Structures are given as C-alpha cells and as structure tokens.
Regions:
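Extracytoplasmic ligand-binding site segments that recognize negatively charged/polar headgroups
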Residues: 2, 10-144, 176
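A ligand-binding cleft/hinge motif common to bilobed small-molecule-binding domains
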Residues: 21-25, 145-164
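A bilobed periplasmic-binding-protein/Venus flytrap-type ligand-binding module shared by bacterial periplasmic
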Residues: 62-69, 108, 178-193, 212-213
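Short, catalytically relevant binding-site loops at active-site mouths
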Residues: 99, 146, 152-156, 172-176, ...
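N-terminal secretory/targeting leader peptides
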Residues: 157-163, 167-176, 181
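Mature extracytoplasmic/periplasmic domains
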Residues: 184-245
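Conserved C-terminal helix/tail region of periplasmic/extracytoplasmic solute-binding proteins
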Residues: 239-271
Length: 271
C-alpha cells in the first residue's frame, strides 16, 4: 500500500484495516471517499461523522491461560497485574505493536491508562514478543502462564481444535478494537468502482453481513445484534467494561508510543 501511495493512485477499491487510527491517517491524506450509509444509525461503535470510514467488526484484546495447567486464582485478573506480577516473570507473552495494528491499539490504550510505566513493567517482567500462534502453543506446553491476545484467536482454537485454552476478561477492562472499512476516493482509485463499494459497505453493515463477522469469531457492530462469537460473552457487556482507545492519540502519537515501547521492551529481531 505504501508503495502504491507514492504513485498517487491505489489499485484497490476498498480497504479493511485493523483499527481506526490508520483510517484517520488515510482520511487526512485525502485517500478516502465519503459515503453516508443509511445503516449508520444502527451502529453501536463510533464511525466517521463525515462518512469516510465505518466499523464493520470488533476485535477484543484479552488475556488467556491454560486451565489444564493453571487455575484462575493463580493468574492476573487485570492487564495491570499481567505486567506487574513478578511471579510471572519470563512467562508472559504478547504481540508486537510495531507490526500489529491491534497490539498497537492495545498498548496505546494501556499507556493512556497507566502511563509509559506500564511498558517498563512489561520489560521488567521479561514479556515475550511473538505471534499469537506461537503464544498459544506456549500456553499448551506450559512455557507461558498467561498471554495477551485477541479473543478471536482463542475462540477459533477452542472450536476448531478442541483446545481448553480460556479467556480472562480483565477486571480493569477489555480493549475493544473496531476494524474499519473505507472506499478509496475516485481521484485516487485506478478503478473508480464507487457505486459497488457503497453497496458492499451497506452489505457488510447489514445483519446478513454481520453474521459472517460473528462466524469469524469477532463481535458485531450493530445495535441489538444478539449473536456472539462461539464461546464468547455478551457484546453489550463487553462495551460496558471497554477500557477504550483514544484513536486520535493512537494516530498522532504513534511514533512516540512505539519508541517508548521499544525502549522498555526487548523485541526480537526478524530472522
């Protein structure tokens, strides 16, 4: 995408990205088409008031553990304890905020709530930075006691592989992360399929479209949508305990947040 941007034209008609911060950047850069979808009044998550982006599915950052090896009483009940409990030193894992949009959103939220000292605590506790699949494998073997991970990864593992890995919904709040859909502006698009893109946006935000999101282990963005992902909990209940993400801060202070994280936490070099 970055390479295409240098040419001034994008080959894609639409984009679906992990979180709204990147949508703010694309909007500011003039890359997006504004569309006033009639579905917007049914949304229970924020959207761009000028119609440049809409949430279409919701990821949920949680903690996870292996109940065959640990009991909930032995493990942190909050994201704060996850970072600060020294009995877990070297036995915790999370994703890489430099490469993962959802992990970036999570560390932005946690540093907003607890300050950059949160990163220092993670570093002091020797948090391992790795992919979700690697972290889940380490939970299975007992190399990790608890991990920070997207709920959908745990639910998928439970349904498709019969895993016993379970979620902890932290008492200091879950971190809900809406993935956003956008249409490329006509003067920035190689194809100019605006009408089709608007129709797809409406479909993604319809009840039928939202059922596919839930089947993919993510939560619906629609008000009154009662279906939840396999083995998950009520979406409105999660909204009530959402820690929240300041998306403007996540965008405008992205470099600072990443730098502070790198200064505190060891990130393995790519092989």
């Amino acid at each position: 995408l970055a390479g295409e941007m240098e040419t001034g034209t994008l080959g894609c008609d639409m984009m679906l990205v992990a979180e709204p911060a990147y949508s703010l950047e694309l909007k500011e850069g003039g890359w997006l088409h504004s569309y006033d979808t009639p579905v917007k009044e049914n949304l229970r998550f924020p959207y761009d008031e000028e119609g440049y982006w809409y949430p279409v599915r919701v990821c949920n950052m949680v903690l996870a553990y292996n109940p065959e090896l640990k009991t909930p009483e032995e493990l942190p009940k909050t994201f704060k304890e996850f970072a600060e409990d020294t009995s877990l030193k070297g036995r915790i894992s999370m994703g890489n905020p430099l490469t993962s949009g959802t992990t970036m959103a999570a560390v932005a939220s946690l540093s907003d709530k607890y300050g950059y000292e949160y990163f220092t605590a993670l570093g002091n506790n020797d948090v391992m930075i790795e992919s979700g699949s690697t972290a889940l494998a380490k939970l299975q073997t007992g190399e990790c006691d608890v991990i920070m991970i997207l709920e959908e990864s745990v639910l998928k593992e439970r349904k498709e592989n019969g895993s016993k890995i379970a979620c902890i919904y932290p008492d200091d709040g879950v971190i809900l992360i809406p993935s956003t859909v956008m249409t490329v502006a006509e003067d920035r698009s190689a194809n100019m399929n605006i009408e089709a893109c608007e129709a797809i946006t409406d479909y993604l935000l319809s009840e039928e479209g939202q059922k596919f999101m839930v089947e993919g282990y993510m939560h619906s963005v629609l008000k009154g949508f009662s279906e939840v992902p396999f083995d998950s909990v009520d979406t409105d209940g999660l909204i009530e305990k959402d820690m929240g993400v300041d998306w403007v801060r996540c965008y405008t202070m992205r470099d600072e947040i990443r730098t502070k994280f790198q200064e505190a936490v060891t990130i393995p070099e790519k092989k």
